[in-house]
Amino acid sequence: TSLPYVNIHCSLTQNIEMPQTDAAYIYLVVEGTLRLYTPAGIMDYESGQYSISAIDTPETGYILAKSDSQRFVAVSVEFNPSDVITILLELDKDLIGRIAGGQQSEQMMDMSDGEVTRSVTRLLEIADDPVKAEFLGRNIRREIIFHLLCGKSGTEFMESIIRLQNSGDIYEANTWIKENYKGAFTVE
């Protein structure tokens, strides 16, 4: 694609290569069924489901079932910690508190998990149009990160990205920054 952080993975063989990157990524199954071997165990993913590498970095993958067209297709979308932290700093402090405390409603988490898939689909739809990809791609990727944070794995995702044992520290830091700094600033 024209978006450097989006990759399409197709495989006709049973074994698949996971993305070789230091960046965090989601790996969304588009066609087929996948089994991932991670440090936490074995996990299966069907079409429309995704894995978050920052939570459980897959070691290997194996195709359990191919689509009717006898292929396996997945999409990976990469992001770095600064992408996620920037979004965390922009979020409402109450929302960050609910994410950090694992207190999102089931309905909100289910909706957000579904929105991740829809947002990735939209990203693919614009990926071949350089004008749309440059502007909209950036915003859709932010949308994906937002929905990952609000989804069922939001707390683990946030903790793994910022590498803190207690995600409450982020909530407190974000609250302090919002209360004490009204102007723009950068974090190095």
Predicted regions and their residues:
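N-terminal regulatory/effector-sensing and dimerization cores
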Residues: S2-G97
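Short, solvent-exposed positions on alpha-helices
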Residues: M43, V131-L136
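A short, Lys/Arg-enriched amphipathic alpha-helix from helix-turn-helix/homeodomain DNA-binding modules
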Residues: D110-E125, G137-R141, I145-L149, F157-V187
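Aromatic/histidine-rich interaction motifs
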Residues: L89-R118
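Short glycine/proline- and charge-enriched loop/turn segments
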Residues: S67, A100-G101, T155-F157
